């Protein structure tokens, strides 16, 4: 185990604000679901919002993957204090994310019924109608989300993390306030129901973007960057991003596509299963938020060591991180099992006995898989990405998603007609063995790949 206090200080300095930010985002989703599920048509409303959010999750993962891919390069250049190249990389990523957001908004607006038809059974008329209303508003939140998260990703990679927590707290109260006003009709506004939840999300994202933008270009001093810097790029850095960073984005994108297709299968199995899956996924997010936040910190500390060409220290960090995350996985599995009943009781839709029974079984299954999730996240999201081994991570996600998870879920649902909790288990079956792949990969040295360039090599 590493005894250097700076290692732990740096990792937790990055992870704790990020974890709190994730927890705040989690609270936003939970409060949103609670308000929507308390409507008269609570089960249908929650099913509609959760299924549209599975489409949004595909977009979100795509953008966050593109941003996370930049951290592979930024963290290593940060280890060398090469600020000029960090600004160029950020400019490249921001424009890519903005372009992706516009593409998604265009598709959602032009083909809304076809898009919702992917994740909702055509026979679920009430769910579909509500989903179309929600999607027509919430899709516009994709644009401010892309810009603000590109900014936040850059700041986190250069160890500026506290401001993102403050902004997340403000976003939480903004979102909850807007939800209360527009869903139920308060302060003189009409009660919009499900579309009100979409409007609240859009307004909260705009507020978040304004605050992040002002802080990045007016307040923070770590990196001297101005809006005009967004117009400056370098072709060779774009090629490096395509080589080392883009595989992360594509990997997350294809994995999110797998998630969307899993939601499509669930969407064919009734509103009760859709609602139960929404509640269960929220509980699983509670169980993994600290894990993935700490993995982001691991990515930075490992990336800095590799960027500084201190490979012995990178290996030492790797070994310590793996032990830490295995222990964290055990703890989080216990926490989820302990809290599942009171958590389920927060949802109006869980008053339906079918929904409640499904939630209890599915959360128990998910809790066990959290142990494997925690370990492989430390490797694939933290160690491997920070060390430049992003292509291997993308390959593992690709093979596991398309050759294992989707076929298993499809067969369980439509061929073997398995009980719904077993179908849910199949959606997470990869979490039971990816940890072994990660463990084997880190036994050698192939995962260490310095992706920075010396000045003369860049020309």
Regions found by a protein language model. Give the residues of each.
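Small-residue hotspots at the loop-to-helix junctions and early N-terminal turns
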Residues: 43-54, 131, 135, 271-286, ...
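Small-residue-rich hydrophobic transmembrane alpha-helices
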Residues: 46-106, 145-164, 276-340, 374-393
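Transmembrane helical elements of multi-pass membrane transporters/channels
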Residues: 13-32, 137, 148, 171, ...
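Short alpha-helical transmembrane segments in multi-pass integral membrane proteins
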Residues: 1-18, 74-141, 189-246, 302-369, ...
């Amino acid at each position: 185990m590493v005894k250097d206090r700076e290692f732990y200080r740096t990792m937790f300095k990055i992870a704790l604000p990020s974890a709190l930010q994730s927890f705040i985002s989690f609270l936003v989703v939970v409060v949103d679901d609670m308000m929507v599920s308390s409507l008269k048509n609570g089960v249908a409303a929650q099913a509609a919002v959760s299924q549209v959010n599975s489409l949004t999750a595909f977009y979100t993962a795509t953008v966050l993957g593109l941003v996370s891919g930049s951290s592979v390069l930024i963290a290593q250049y940060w280890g060398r204090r090469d600020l000029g190249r960090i600004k160029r990389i950020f400019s490249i990523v921001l424009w890519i994310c903005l372009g992706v957001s516009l593409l998604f908004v265009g598709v959602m607006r032009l083909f809304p019924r076809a898009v919702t038809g992917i994740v909702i059974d055509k026979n679920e008329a009430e769910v579909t109608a509500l989903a179309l209303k929600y999607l027509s508003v919430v899709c516009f939140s994709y644009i401010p989300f892309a810009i603000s998260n590109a900014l936040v990703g850059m700041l986190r990679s250069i160890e500026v993390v506290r401001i993102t927590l403050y902004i997340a707290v403000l976003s939480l109260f903004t979102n909850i306030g807007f939800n209360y006003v527009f869903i139920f009709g308060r302060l003189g506004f009409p009660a919009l129901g499900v579309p009100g939840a979409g409007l609240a999300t859009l307004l909260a994202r705009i507020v978040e973007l304004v605050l992040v933008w002002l802080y990045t270009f007016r307040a923070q001093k770590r990196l001297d960057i101005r809006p005009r810097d967004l117009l400056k790029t370098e072709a060779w850095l774009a090629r490096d991003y395509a080589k080392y960073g883009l595989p992360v984005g594509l990997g997350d994108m294809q994995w999110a596509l797998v998630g969307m297709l899993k939601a499509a299968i669930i969407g064919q199995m009734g509103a009760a299963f859709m609602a139960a899956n929404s509640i269960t996924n929220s509980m699983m997010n509670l169980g993994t938020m600290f894990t993935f936040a700490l993995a982001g910190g691991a990515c930075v500390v490992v990336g800095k060591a590799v960027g500084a060409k201190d490979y012995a220290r990178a290996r030492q960090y790797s070994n310590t991180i793996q032990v830490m995350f295995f222990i964290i996985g055990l703890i989080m599995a216990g926490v989820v099992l302990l809290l599942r009943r009171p958590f389920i009781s927060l949802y109006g839709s869980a008053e339906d006995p079918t929904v409640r029974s499904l939630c209890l079984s599915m959360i128990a299954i998910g809790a066990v898989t959290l142990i494997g999730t925690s370990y492989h996240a430390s490797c694939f999201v933290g160690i491997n990405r920070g060390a430049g081994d992003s292509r291997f991570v993308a390959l593992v996600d690709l093979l596991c998603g398309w050759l294992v998870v989707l076929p298993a879920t499809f067969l369980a649902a439509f061929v073997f007609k398995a009980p719904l909790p077993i179908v849910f288990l199949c959606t997470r079956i990869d979490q039971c063995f990816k940890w072994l792949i990660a463990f084997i990969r880190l036994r050698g040295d192939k995962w260490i790949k310095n992706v920075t360039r010396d000045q003369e090599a860049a020309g």
